[in-house]
């Protein structure tokens, strides 16, 4: 009788890359693999968690391996033999895109980001041939443009006419400082609009310059997506949101949370600001301070979805 493996995606039902790799690897070892059921027992269980504030399971039967950024300091890192296994996309039958990391790490040392501690300085991780099995691709790289290997892989993506989304965002400072990279990105077929980040007002100049270069070389769609990190300085976030509106960019606000703390520790004003930015009917028609100070701010409670994400 074959051994069995249970998989737990603790955060959500969104496709989990690590679990897909684990599934593929253990299937080659003859294991029967399925998503975890509390009514069954398994020879081995893998649990993956992205966010530290997501409640863990109270009880795991049998032998459990825990991994992911949500387990700060205690996460198991996948060994190379699993890390470089093509993901088992059959775990998510409706998934119409491939997923993976071309590079790991980053050249930046942002104090709010766990990547420098978790992955170190930027380095090549995998050729797209290792994990691409669809015509659509979601790359999870943190700073792919900072790597020559990453740029070579983008060329390969272009040549193969793969639609791609770098869903962690592209470094606006690199784009702003190198028109050749803006030209390269203009040749990409985008699965979703190109993403950048403006985590503080000091990054505004780079985002504006990058936007101008990208539009100059006709990188489309031209309404680029911009992550806004929202800390306690709401004035800073408000100024950044205003620039996004001025330059016709599409902002998405994320309330900053120290990863060692609970999501409950974010402030009400952080939440209100994220609601204002992310519920577009408000962002386009009402100033934040009017939204904050009038009954309008109560309207979002009737809308589906929280429209706020801790980062």
How should each PLM-predicted stretch be described?
Residues 1-66, 71-73:
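A short, structured N-terminal alpha-helical element that caps or precedes a catalytic domain
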Residues 3, 60-65, 162, 219-222, ...:
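A short helix->loop->beta-strand "cap" motif at the edges of active sites that frequently abuts
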Residues 1-2, 36-43, 57-61, 93-95, ...:
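Flexible, charged surface loops at secondary-structure boundaries
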Residues 65-91:
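Ser/Thr/Gly-rich flexible loops in soluble cytosolic domains mediating phosphotransfer, phosphorylation
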Residues 43-45, 57, 73-81, 111, ...:
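Short, charged, surface-exposed secondary-structure boundary motifs
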Residues 8, 46-47, 114-210, 221-231, ...:
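Core AdoMet radical
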């Amino acid at each position: 009788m074959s051994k069995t493996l249970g998989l737990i995606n603790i955060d959500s039902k969104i496709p989990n890359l690590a679990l897909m790799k684990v599934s593929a690897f253990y299937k080659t070892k003859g294991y029967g693999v399925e998503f975890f059921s509390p009514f069954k027992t398994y020879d081995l269980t893998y649990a993956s968690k992205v966010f530290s504030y997501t409640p863990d399971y109270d009880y795991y039967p049998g032998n459990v391996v825990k991994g992911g950024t949500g387990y700060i300091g205690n996460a198991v890192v996948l060994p190379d033999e699993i890390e470089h296994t093509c993901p088992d996309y059959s775990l998510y039958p409706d998934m119409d895109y491939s997923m993976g990391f071309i590079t790991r790490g980053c050249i930046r040392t942002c104090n709010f980001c766990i990547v420098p501690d978790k992955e170190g300085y930027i380095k090549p991780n995998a050729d797209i041939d290792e994990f691409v099995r669809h015509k659509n691709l979601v790359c999870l790289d943190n700073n792919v443009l900072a790597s020559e290997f990453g740029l070579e892989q983008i060329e390969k993506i272009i040549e193969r006419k793969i639609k791609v989304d770098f869903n962690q965002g592209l470094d606006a400072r690199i784009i702003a400082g190198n028109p050749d990279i803006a030209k390269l990105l203009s040749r990409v077929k985008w699965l979703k609009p190109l993403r950048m980040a403006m985590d503080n007002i000091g990054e505004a100049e780079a985002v504006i310059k990058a936007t101008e270069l990208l539009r100059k070389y006709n990188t489309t769609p031209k309404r680029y997506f911009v992550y806004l990190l929202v800390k306690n300085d709401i004035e800073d976030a408000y100024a950044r949101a205003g620039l996004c509106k001025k330059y016709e960019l599409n902002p998405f606000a994320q309330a900053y949370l120290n990863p060692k703390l609970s999501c409950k520790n974010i402030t009400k004003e952080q939440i209100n600001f994220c609601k204002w930015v992310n519920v577009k009917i408000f962002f386009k028609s009402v100033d934040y301070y009017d939204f904050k100070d009038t009954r309008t701010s109560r309207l979002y409670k009737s809308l589906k979805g929280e429209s706020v994400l801790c980062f």
